[in-house]
């Protein structure tokens, strides 16, 4: 029998498996990772920033030809809120400089996971909205 995140003692409902909790604490200790609480709002912000950063790379690689294509997929395929207009429209509302600033701060703690998209750098430098970005404009 394998070990999972939870145990179901006596078939009564799940409880956190203390062995897994101990394993997590031990691995964090050896990796010198300080465990911290992260709010739901912070998790949501990090996920959106990661999605925006990756979507910008998708534009830069020519996989998508426009921010509108990404908006369409984000709303119809991923369930992104329609009233936000799609992921890239929402990113334009947040503002590219704001997004670049937030990702740059996160990159200070993990530069591999938070490598800033060249498209975002370009848009910030030129004052271009993501919705106005075209692949042949990049000059980084």
Question: Locations of the language-model features?
Answer:
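N-terminal glycine-rich phosphate-binding loop for ADP-containing cofactors
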Residues: 1-140
